[in-house]
Each structure stands twice: as structure tokens, then as C-alpha cells.
């Protein structure tokens, strides 16, 4: 009896305890978590205002106005006026007046007056004045005094006293010493200067400047130094 009674209370009490524990644990979480806690209040309180405030306005404000405001007006305003305003007026304003104003007046103003004003007066003024002013007075002034000064005093100084003292011996040395260099000095530069004018019209300055001073300086200095010494010595000796 004692053994049977002790065994019976051990077996049945754990069974109802297990049933009692499982029953209250299973139904309350199903009823609390599913309809009340997780689904209804969480979705209504947290995600609804979050979806309405964060994604809805962001999605509506960013892509919708962005596509309409940025893309549409940008493509219409940027390439539209730029392509129409820049290309059309630029090609008409920049190359149009430049090509008409620069090329046309430049070719008419620059080469026109330059060709008429520069070469025209230059060719008429430079060679004309040079040939008339340089060649003519130079040949007239240089050979004139040189031919008159050299032979005139030579003939007057030397043959003057020579015929009074002795005609024959005095005339011979006078003719040899004076007349020969006189004819050489007078005739050579004159003959050389007469054809030089014709030849020196083309190289005006080159030929006129070089031979003239050389010929004028050499004969002018040489005859007065030689002739007066010989004339004075002959007059004194006689």
C-alpha cells in the first residue's frame, strides 16, 4: 500500500503540471505578438510615418522635380539658346564684319595708296632729283675749278717769265713740265667725267663719290708743289 501510494502521486502530478505550463505559454505569445504588438501598432506607428516622411517625400521631391526641373529645362535652356544664340550671331557678327571690314578696306587702303604714293613719288623724286642735283652740279663744280686753277696759274707762272729771259730753253721745260700734267689733269678728268655722267646715272652715289675726291685731291696738290718750285728755280737761275 505504501509503495503503491507513493508511486501514484509521483506519476500523475507531473502530467498536469506539464499541461498547465504549456497551455499558458503557447496561447499568450500568439495572441499578444501577432495581432497587437508586432503587426498592428508597429506598422501603424513606426513604418507609416517613416514611409510617409522619409521615402515618400524624398522619392517625390528628388526624382520627380529633379527630372522635370533639372533635365527638362537644362536641355531646353542650355543647348537650345546656346546653339541658337552663340552659333548664329557669332558667325554673323564676328566673321561677317571682320571679313567685310578688314579684308575689303585693307586691300583697298593699304596696297592702293602704297602702290600709288610710295613707288610713284619715290621713283620720280629720288632718281630725278639725284640725277639732276648730284650729277650735274658735281661735275660742273669739280672739274670747273680744277681745270681752271691748275693750268691757268701754271701757264701764267711758268711761261710768263720764261719768254722774257730765254724763249727756247724756257718754253721747252714749261711745255714738258706744265703742259703735259696740265693736259693730263684737265683732259683726263673731263673725259672721264663726261662719260661717267652717262654711266653713273644708274649707280648714282657709288661711282660719283669714289673717283671724284681721288681725282680732285691728287692733281690739285701735285702740280702746285712741282711747278712753282721749278719755275722759281729757273727764274732765279736765269
Swiss-Prot record:
A Gene Ontology biological process in which this protein takes part is: keratinization
Give positions of region: 21 X 8 AA approximate tandem repeats. Answer: 52-223
Give the subcellular location.
Cytoplasm
sequence repeat ranges per the UniProt record: 52-59, 60-67, 68-75, 76-83, 84-91, 92-99, 100-107, 108-115, 116-123, 124-131, 132-139, 140-147, 148-155, 156-163, 164-175, 176-183, 184-191, 192-199, 200-207, 208-215, 216-223
Q: Cite the record's Low complexity compositional bias ranges.
A: 163-175
Coiled-coil region(s)? none
Top-level taxonomic group: Eukaryota
Its chief place of residence is: cytoplasm
Record-level GO cellular component terms:
cytoplasm
The segments labelled Disordered in the record are: 1-67, 110-238
Q: Which residues carry this modification: N-acetylserine?
A: 2
State one Pfam family annotation. Cornifin
Q: Which UniProt keywords apply?
A: Acetylation, Cytoplasm, Keratinization, Repeat
**What does the protein in this record do?**
Cross-linked envelope protein of keratinocytes.
* Family the UniProt entry places it in: Belongs to the cornifin (SPRR) family.
How is this protein named in the record? Small proline-rich protein 3
Which species does the entry assign this protein to? Mus musculus
Q: What is the lineage of its organism?
A: Eukaryota, Metazoa, Chordata, Craniata, Vertebrata
Amino acid at each position: 500500500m505504501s509503495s503503491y501510494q507513493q508511486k501514484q502521486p509521483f506519476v500523475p502530478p507531473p502530467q498536469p503540471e506539464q499541461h498547465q505550463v504549456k497551455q499558458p505559454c503557447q496561447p499568450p505569445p500568439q495572441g499578444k505578438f501577432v495581432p497587437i504588438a508586432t503587426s498592428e501598432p508597429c506598422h501603424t506607428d513606426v513604418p507609416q510615418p517613416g514611409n510617409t516622411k522619409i521615402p515618400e517625400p524624398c522619392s517625390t521631391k528628388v526624382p520627380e522635380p529633379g527630372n522635370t526641373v533639372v533635365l527638362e529645362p537644362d536641355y531646353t535652356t542650355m543647348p537650345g539658346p546656346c546653339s541658337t544664340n552663340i552659333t548664329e550671331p557669332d558667325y554673323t557678327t564676328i566673321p561677317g564684319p571682320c571679313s567685310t571690314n578688314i579684308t575689303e578696306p585693307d586691300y583697298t587702303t593699304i596696297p592702293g595708296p602704297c602702290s600709288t604714293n610710295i613707288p610713284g613719288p619715290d621713283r620720280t623724286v629720288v632718281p630725278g632729283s639725284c640725277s639732276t642735283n648730284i650729277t650735274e652740279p658735281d661735275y660742273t663744280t669739280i672739274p670747273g675749278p680744277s681745270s681752271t686753277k691748275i693750268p691757268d696759274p701754271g701757264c701764267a707762272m711758268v711761261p710768263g717769265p720764261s719768254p722774257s729771259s730765254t724763249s727756247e730753253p724756257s718754253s721747252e721745260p714749261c711745255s714738258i713740265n706744265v703742259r703735259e700734267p696740265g693736259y693730263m689733269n684737265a683732259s683726263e678728268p673731263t673725259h672721264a667725267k663726261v662719260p661717267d655722267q652717262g654711266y653713273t646715272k644708274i649707280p648714282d652715289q657709288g661711282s660719283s663719290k669714289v673717283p671724284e675726291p681721288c681725282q680732285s685731291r691728287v692733281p690739285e696738290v701735285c702740280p702746285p708743289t712741282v711747278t712753282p718750285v721749278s719755275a722759281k728755280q729757273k727764274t732765279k737761275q736765269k
